[in-house]
Amino acid sequence: VNSNYTGGEPKRSRTAYTRQQVLELEKEFLFNRYLTRRRRIQHTLT
């Protein structure tokens, strides 16, 4: 095992959503099982 191997691109940091944002995401998920990254970002801006 090569200890210098990082696995490619670095991982993005995890987004912390407010309770309201989580509720909105869950509601949208009921209608659309796949939310694009753009759509998730839009929820963080509201």
UniProtKB/Swiss-Prot annotation:
DNA-binding region: 1-46
InterPro entries the record matches: Antp_homeobox_Deformed_sf (IPR050609), HD (IPR001356), Homeodomain-like_sf (IPR009057)
GO BP terms: anterior/posterior pattern specification; embryonic skeletal system morphogenesis; positive regulation of transcription by RNA polymerase II
GO cellular component: nucleoplasm
Chief subcellular location: nucleus
Domain of life: Eukaryota
A GO MF label: DNA-binding transcription factor activity, RNA polymerase II-specific
Keywords assigned by UniProt, alphabetized: Developmental protein, DNA-binding, Homeobox, Nucleus, Transcription, Transcription regulation
Protein location: Nucleus
Stated family: Belongs to the Antp homeobox family. Deformed subfamily.
Subunit structure: Forms a DNA-binding heterodimer with transcription factor PBX1.
Function: Sequence-specific transcription factor which is part of a developmental regulatory system that provides cells with specific positional identities on the anterior-posterior axis.
Protein name per the record: Homeobox protein Hox-D4
Organism placement in taxonomy: Eukaryota, Metazoa, Chordata, Craniata, Vertebrata
